[in-house]
A protein has these predicted regions:
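Tubulin/FtsZ superfamily GTPase core signature
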Residues: 1-164
């Protein structure tokens, strides 16, 4: 049909049981057969983000937010014009027939905001593996009118440096 299909899903927490995990893994394998790209967020990684006081509802809400941000991020790449536009053809060239994919997100304010956000995205605890062997990378930078040219360059340079050391 020619449509670009991207699946963004979670893998259950270990405490949800082996049966649920088996079902999820089978579903993920099925998705890989029909989707160009599948991004799997392991819910267990959320345990590294939260504190001991995080309730079950907050944990599941956090998992849902990660999924939402993943879908929204990809959608925004295509639909929201930026200073350096990424269009559907760019997204398709990286994600078509890509198989498994990773997604890192970073956010920061103030001094060293770009470096902090970039390092958060590259080293995100939600990433199950590294970028090693990546065939393509999509980078999206959002900022206010004060976002500087050198800051944007820092994102690209930091990513390249991280990718070279893998």
């Amino acid at each position: 049909m020619g449509a670009l299909t991207i699946g963004v899903v979670t893998r259950p927490f270990t405490f949800e049981g082996k049966r649920r995990t088996r079902q999820a893994l089978a579903g993920i394998e099925n998705l890989k057969e029909v989707c160009d790209t599948v991004i799997v967020i392991p819910n267990d990684r959320l345990l590294q983000l939260g504190d001991a006081e995080l309730s079950m509802m907050e944990a599941f809400r956090a998992a849902d937010e990660v999924l939402y941000n993943g879908v929204q991020g990809i959608t925004n790449l295509i639909t929201i014009p930026g200073m350096i536009n990424v269009d559907f053809a760019d997204v398709r060239s990286v994600m078509a027939d890509a198989g498994s994919a990773l997604m890192g997100v970073g956010s920061a304010r103030g001094e060293n905001r770009v470096m902090t956000a970039t390092e958060q995205a590259i080293n995100s605890p939600l990433l199950e593996t590294t970028m090693e062997g990546a065939k393509g990378v999509l980078i999206s930078v959002a900022g206010g009118s004060d976002l500087g040219l050198m800051e944007v360059n820092t994102v690209s340079y930091t990513h390249l440096r991280a990718h070279e050391t893998l």
